[in-house]
C-alpha cells in the first residue's frame, strides 16, 4: 500500500504493547520499540481501541486523503477471514452498599486478574488502566465501567465461551473483595456526582468538552453501558450494504435489547435511556448518518465525514494534548494551534476514528452500537442477531430489499421513538415488533446456513419478541410488584 512506504515508524503503545518483532515494509526495517510495562502479546483484529498508540518517529511527508481512505480499505477481507468481535461494558458495585466502585478498587481487581489469570497490565501515568491478553483487552470507561473487548473469533460458540470465561474471572476476583458487576444499560441508582472518575487523560479532555456540545454527554460517559459486535466486510460494496442495513435496523436492536429503564432510584420514562442519551451527547459525532444512504456513499465519503468531526486530542510523548473542536484537516497541513508544525500519523487517524460515535461506526470493520448492556445470555445473543443478518448473503440481501424504501425520516423517527416505546413503536401499517419477528427469522435462517449450530444463541431474542415484552418492561413490572417500587433488587437480578 502506498501509505506504508512513506512512514518510517514504529508503533508503540503507551503500555509498551508494541509488537516486539522486526517487520519490513518495502525493504525498510521497522523495529517496534518496547517500553517498560507489559509483555505486549498480540494486537490487531476487530477489537476496541486500548489506550491510543503513537508513532515513535515523526512523519516524513504529510498524510493525504488517499492514505486515510487506504487505511479503511485495508479492512476488506475475504469471507473466510471474517471474524466476530464482541465488546461489553458493566457496572462494578460494592455488594454491601450498592455504591459504584472507586478507582483503587478497580485497580485491585485489575491487579488480581493480571496475577491470577496472566493478563498484561496497561499503564498510564503509573495507573493501571487496563489489561491485555492475546487479542483480548480489558479497559475502563470514564466512570469505571469495566469493558471487555473480545478477540476476533470465528464462531458464536467461541464468542460466548470468551464472555463466560471473562465473567468467571471477574467474579472470582471481585467476590473476594465484596464487589459485584451489573449488566444493565444505565446506572439505576446513583447520581452523576456519585460516580468516580477514572485517571485517563482522554476522559479528562472529554469531560470538559461534553457540556459545550450537548446536555447528556456526561451521562453517556459515566452512567451508560453497552454491548456491541464488530463485523468484517469484503469490499467497498459489501461495506456499504452492511453499513446501510446496520443503520436501518439499529433501532430494532435497540428495542429488543432495551434495558435501561431506571435513573436515580426510579423509572426514567424510557425503555432505553442509554439510547436516548446519544441523541443529545454531541450531534457532530453521533446519529443515523443519512449520507450513508446516498448513491455517492463509499469509503471516501466516510473519510470526508470523519475529517469534519471536531477533534478531541492528539497523543504525543505519552501525554494527551487537548485539541477539542479543532479540525483534522488543519492537522494534516501542520496547522493545529495546540501542536504547530506537528503532522498526523496513521495512528492519529486511527485514534480520531475512535472519537466518532454514530449508531454504526466504520473503522477497518463495522461496529453495531445500538444495544444496552445486559445479562450474559444477551451478551451472546447480540452478536448472534447481527451475524445471522450480515454474514449470510441471502439474509443480507433480504434485509437490504426490505429496508431499501425506508426514508431518512422513517429511520430518524425509529431512532427517536424506540427508546421510549420499544417494540410497541408504530411503523407503517404495523409495529416494530412485527418488523422484529421478520428480522429474527432472517437472522435464524442466516445462522442455520452458516452451519455452526449457532441458532440457540437467539433464544433470548426469541423470548423478547414472542412475548412482546422488552427486558426494560420486565424490570419495570418487577419494580411495581415484587420489588415494591425499589430499584435495589435490580443489582441482584442482573448480577453477573
Swiss-Prot record:
The gene is GSH1-2. Residues 29-38 have a biased composition (Low complexity). Its EC number is 6.3.2.2. Belongs to the carboxylate-amine ligase family. Glutamate--cysteine ligase type 2 subfamily. Keywords: ATP-binding, Chloroplast, Disulfide bond, Glutathione biosynthesis, Ligase, Nucleotide-binding, Plastid, Transit peptide. Residues 1-34 form a transit peptide. It is found in: Plastid, Chloroplast. InterPro entries: GCL_bact_plant, GCS2, Gln_synth/guanido_kin_cat_dom, Glut_cys_lig_pln_type. Homodimer or monomer when oxidized or reduced, respectively. Pfam families: GCS2. This is Glutamate--cysteine ligase B, chloroplastic. The lineage of its organism: Eukaryota, Viridiplantae, Streptophyta, Embryophyta, Tracheophyta. Its main location: plastid. GO terms for cellular component: chloroplast. Disulfide bonds join 160-380. The keyword DNA damage does not apply. One of its GO terms (molecular function) is glutamate-cysteine ligase activity. Residues 14-53 are annotated as: Disordered. One of its GO terms (biological process) is glutathione biosynthetic process. Pathway: Sulfur metabolism; glutathione biosynthesis; glutathione from L-cysteine and L-glutamate: step 1/2. It catalyses: L-cysteine + L-glutamate + ATP = gamma-L-glutamyl-L-cysteine + ADP + phosphate + H(+).
Amino acid at each position: 500500500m502506498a501509505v506504508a512506504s512513506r512512514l518510517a515508524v514504529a508503533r508503540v503503545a503507551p503500555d509498551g504493547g508494541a509488537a516486539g518483532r522486526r517487520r519490513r515494509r518495502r525493504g525498510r526495517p521497522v523495529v517496534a520499540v518496547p517500553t517498560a510495562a507489559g509483555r505486549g502479546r498480540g494486537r490487531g483484529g476487530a477489537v476496541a481501541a486500548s489506550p491510543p498508540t503513537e508513532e515513535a518517529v515523526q512523519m516524513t511527508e504529510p498524510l493525504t486523503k488517499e492514505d486515510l481512505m487506504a487505511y479503511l480499505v485495508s479492512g476488506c477481507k475475504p469471507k473466510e477471514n471474517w471474524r466476530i468481535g464482541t465488546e461489553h461494558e458493566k457496572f462494578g458495585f460494592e455488594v454491601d452498599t450498592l455504591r459504584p466502585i472507586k478507582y483503587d478498587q478497580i485497580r485491585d481487581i485489575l491487579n488480581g486478574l493480571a496475577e491470577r489469570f496472566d493478563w498484561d497490565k496497561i499503564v498510564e501515568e503509573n495507573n493501571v488502566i487496563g489489561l491485555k491478553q492475546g487479542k483480548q483487552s480489558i479497559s475502563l470507561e470514564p466512570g469505571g465501567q469495566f469493558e471487555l473487548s473480545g478477540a476476533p473469533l470465528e464462531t458464536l460458540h467461541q464468542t460466548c465461551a470468551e464472555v463466560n470465561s471473562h465473567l468467571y474471572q471477574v467474579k472470582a476476583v471481585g467476590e473476594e473483595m465484596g464487589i459485584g458487576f451489573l449488566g444493565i444499560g444505565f446506572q439505576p441508582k446513583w447520581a452523576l456526582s456519585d460516580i468516580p472518575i477514572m485517571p485517563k487523560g482522554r476522559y479528562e479532555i472529554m469531560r470538559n468538552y461534553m457540556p459545550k456540545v450537548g446536555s447528556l454527554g456526561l451521562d453517556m460517559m459515566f452512567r451508560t453501558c453497552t454491548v456491541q459486535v464488530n463485523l468484517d466486510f469484503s469490499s467497498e460494496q459489501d461495506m456499504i450494504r452492511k453499513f446501510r442495513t446496520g443503520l436501518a435496523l439499529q433501532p430494532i436492536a435497540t428495542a429488543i435489547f432495551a434495558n435501561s429503564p431506571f435513573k436515580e432510584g426510579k423509572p426514567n420514562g424510557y425503555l432505553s435511556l442509554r439510547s436516548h442519551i446519544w441523541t443529545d451527547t454531541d450531534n457532530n459525532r453521533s446519529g443515523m448518518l443519512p449520507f450513508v444512504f446516498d448513491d455517492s456513499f463509499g469509503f471516501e465519503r466516510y473519510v470526508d465525514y470523519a475529517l469534519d468531526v471536531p477533534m478531541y486530542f492528539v497523543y504525543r510523548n505519552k501525554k494527551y494534548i487537548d485539541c477539542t473542536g479543532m479540525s483534522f484537516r488543519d492537522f494534516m497541513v501542520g496547522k493545529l494551534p495546540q501542536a504547530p508544525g506537528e503532522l498526523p500519523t496513521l495512528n492519529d487517524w486511527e485514534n480520531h476514528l475512535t472519537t466518532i460515535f454514530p449508531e454504526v461506526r466504520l473503522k477497518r470493520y463495522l461496529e453495531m452500537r445500538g444495544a444496552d448492556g445486559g445479562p450474559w445470555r444477551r451478551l451472546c445473543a447480540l452478536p448472534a442477531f447481527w451475524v445471522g443478518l450480515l454474514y449470510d448473503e441471502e439474509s443480507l440481501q433480504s434485509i437490504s430489499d426490505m429496508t431499501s424504501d425506508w426514508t431518512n425520516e422513517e429511520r430518524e423517527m425509529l431512532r427517536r421513538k424506540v427508546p421510549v416505546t420499544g417494540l410497541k413503536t408504530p411503523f407503517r401499517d404495523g409495529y416494530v415488533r412485527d418488523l422484529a419477528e421478520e428480522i429474527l427469522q432472517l437472522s435464524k435462517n442466516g445462522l442455520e446456513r452458516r452451519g455452526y449450530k449457532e441458532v440457540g444463541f437467539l433464544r433470548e431474542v426469541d423470548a423478547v419478541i414472542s412475548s412482546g415484552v422488552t427486558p426494560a418492561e420486565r424490570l419495570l413490572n418487577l419494580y411495581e410488584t415484587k420489588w415494591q417500587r425499589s430499584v435495589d433488587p435490580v443489582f441482584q437480578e442482573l448480577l453477573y
